[in-house]
Curated annotation (Swiss-Prot):
SUPFAM superfamilies: Ankyrin repeat
UniProt-listed Gene3D superfamilies: Ankyrin repeat-containing domain
Cited PROSITE patterns: ANK_REP_REGION (PS50297), ANK_REPEAT (PS50088)
UniProtKB keywords: ANK repeat, Repeat
Name listed for the protein in its UniProt record: Putative ankyrin repeat protein L59
Pfam family, one: Ank
Spans of repeat ANK: 41-67, 68-97, 98-127, 129-157, 158-187, 188-217, 219-247, 248-277, 279-307
Family matches, as PANTHER family: ANKYRIN REPEAT DOMAIN-CONTAINING PROTEIN 29-LIKE, ANKYRIN REPEAT DOMAIN-CONTAINING PROTEIN 39-RELATED
Amino acid sequence: MELSQYHQILSLLNNFSNKDKISVIECLDSISELRKQMSVLFNKLLKVALKNRNLPMVKFVCDNLEKIDNKAITLAAKYNCLEILKYLHEKGLDTTNHNYSALSWAARNNDFKMVEYLQHQGSDIRANDDEALRWAALSGCLEMVEYLQTQGCDVRNRNDFAIKYAARNGHFKLVRYLHSQGSDIRTDDDYALRWAARNGHLEIVKYLHSKGCNIHAYGDSAIKWASMGGYLEIVEYLHGVGCDIRIDNDYPIRWAASNGHLEVVEYLFSQGCDIGADNNYALMWAKKNGHDDVVEYIVLLKLLKLY
């Protein structure tokens, strides 16, 4: 709204008559629209302030907002600022709102002080099927997981989510701890081993295999995914313990080539994989994806009549 519009409104209100009724209504509508726009602007500013953990800016914005969105509490927890979270709570925001997601973020960030504060304010440590513990496991926060377990959280909730994602994200110490606490390492078709292989976590792959996980689960997906990701040591290990490197029409070498993993391609070829499988899939996709070193290697093999 322009400054001239404010003067127009003041003039109309000071000299109001029936003939000015429509003009006044239009001006009031403009004010209403402006307030909406300002509210949107201040809410955007609040998110920026929270992300930057800027308490003075948070206070300024809150002082200029008629109503503060309760999601601000969750964002304060997400961005790991207890001081701001306390301030927002003092302003009347509910720490237990939005399915206790503030507590889950505090646990994921390994922030014990915030977790304890939220507990003291009434947050349910076991809300959403032990989401706090599950998120802590996702981030590899071993001590937080141990603490939450002492508070009654179940490490096996949601189909052993904790150990599956601890393995997937490479948190070896946590994987061992959760296994010692009764988590099922083989749940969901050996998800833990398969995703550890996919993400390159050799130590976890070895551990899980030693504890009875099936390296062939889900159609030998462990070696297929490790090849696709270029994790040579995992490919070598899995091949050494019996995985079929020629599974699904030489899937491992085809996808290693497609993704540009020359060392894996060289190893798999040396172990008997058919680099020309599926109508020269490896060469075709290495070319399409711009992996010149792989293309040169395959062309050389062809020139030497090695396949």
